[in-house]
Amino acid sequence: MKIPALPSSLVTPFHGFAILCGTGLLAALLWPDPLVRRVLFLHVLVFLQGILSLQIGEAECGYGPLPLGARLWRLLFFSFLALALALPFLLVYRAETAASWPSFLASLAFLFAHGFGWALVGYALAAVIRWEGLRFLAKYGGFLVASLVPLVFGWPITGLIVLPALWEGRGPGLLGLALYLSLSGVGGIWWWKKPRRFSGK
């Protein structure tokens, strides 16, 4: 398939994502507390990726009518592009934290599933909720709730827990990875089966 051009509405979010990832990495490397240093960049990364993915989904919904195959390809490609932008920072962080390569690859798989899943959420919200103010609240409010509430209770269903656990090779990370791979796969299949409702604005 043809490589999609980045929509103008996503140029600034992608630039901001790369800059903030670099800033988060620098802050993590310079942080004096070693316990915070081990997870700070991963927390920053997974949070920024979720926000960017929601913006990807919303922008894609407003791109115009496209065949579902092309639409799915664009969502997958932009999710991969976001991961590719983060990859150099992740490689530096792996060297600094001495994470194993299996843990590193599992973390990449999780980040892709996490990003694609939230891109589908952003797309669906943009297709269903037409009022911009309500959509903004649902999009970012829902993301904050889904990210922070499980963190308070220690549930391995938020990227803020899953990604550090995968990075360190702990069991809850594998559970979260399986959950996000399943949810993103089921979400993609469900979205594929609803062409009229989710055909774009």
Regions found by a protein language model. Give the residues of each.
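Hydrophobic alpha-helical transmembrane segments of membrane proteins
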Residues: 1-201
